[in-house]
Amino acid sequence: MKEAQTVNLDIAAATARFVQADAQARIAGAALLPSLSGGGSEAYSRTSGSSASGLSIGGREVVNYTASMSASYQLDFWGQNRDAAQAAEETAVANRFDRDVVALTTLTTVANAYFNVLASQDRIRTAQSNIASAQRILNAIKERFKAGTGTDLDVAQQEALVANQRASVPPLRQTLDQNINALAILVSRPPESVRVIGGTLNQIAIPRVTPGLPSELLTQRPDIRRQEAQLASATANVGSARAQFFPSIQLTGLGGYQSSALSALFQPHAAFFSLVGSATQPIFDGGRILGNFEFTKARQDELLQTYRKTVIQSFADVDNALMSIRQTTIKLRLQGDVLAASRRAFQLSEQQLRAGTADIVTVLNTQLTLFQAEDSLSQAQLARLLAIVSLYQALGGGWEPRMEKPVDAL
């Protein structure tokens, strides 16, 4: 899990996106402050040396040195720049929570892939054990055949059962390889470098899930918090679009020094300045401002409805996950009973086979029932673990309340 958080490429891309959003927020916030720039120049010119009568009067050379500084500031009377900056900040917050969404999805996918790897390994071990059991029964049937108490049909049926069990192993190994490859992608490693050795679903500690989970836990879901931030950004954009209907007021100042002699450039008599105030009121723009305002209003409404749907969906996700945990727990318990009864029936049929009192049909049926019960138990264990992972994801990363802020790029 820790490795996936640090090296997963999806998380890295999401982190880069919220770094971009932070930069965009700083760009938008710059409009709230004055802009200041400075400059300097040296200008050389020479006048013509020819008079109107065509006589030469000698040209004049002029050198001008200038050092200046200019400042401009837009008075944000109507809050256009303030709302635009707030919208950018909320977008940056939304991108942080989007990174958390990607991280949560990655962690749950890693858990699911790991559990699938363990389940595949368990099923392969079960299949190999079943092959050994079936081969042991085949040897006993062959002994009966040699003793004259068995038939060719008995041997052929058991051989078919052994072959069928052996044929079940390659698909399981293929599934195991695919799950390991999926795990390798999540931790950004070559598949051949990922090894899960000796693990089993039986060793996984199952966390206790209380039935009375508080609804406040849903507030830690990053997708809900992302939608909240996106809605806040859209609301600020509406304010910025509304402000475009009103005049914009710009203040511009320019000051500096200008002299034909560099040594006298910063003398008091060489100073100059100017201050200009201007106001611009939109009169006719073909409906651009109105269209932009209506667009931002519609976008705000869209995100409001999306937010409502996300909240409703979150309750459904939790309910589905809790129901899945309950049903898979019941299934696992019942499947354990099935396995115990099947194992007992198989042991009795094997004893009767060796005593010569069991018919081959009974032996075949008890074997098949046991083999299916063992494989179904592994699948039931996996289903319960996947249900717990789905609840973890539905609650935004656990079932314990926590105070948590989104990850900051800085």
Listing of model-derived features with the role each one plays in the protein:
Residues 1-111, 249-253, 283-293:
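Short flexible linkers and secondary-structure junctions
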Residues 5-8, 30, 60, 67, ...:
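Amphipathic alpha-helical coiled-coil scaffold segments and their short linker/junction regions
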Residues 81, 99-213, 324, 348-351, ...:
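Periplasmic alpha-helical coiled-coil/stalk elements that build and connect Gram-negative outer-membrane
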Residues 191, 205, 209, 322, ...:
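Acidic, low-complexity, intrinsically disordered peripheral segments
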Residues 145-149, 353-357, 394-398:
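A short glycine-centered flexible hinge/capping loop motif at secondary-structure junctions
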Residues 12-13, 29, 75-103, 129, ...:
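Sec/SRP-type N-terminal targeting helices
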Residues 153, 357-378:
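Short terminal targeting/anchoring segments
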Residues 2, 41-70, 193-210, 239, ...:
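Small/polar, glycine/serine/threonine/aspartate-rich low-complexity segments that form flexible
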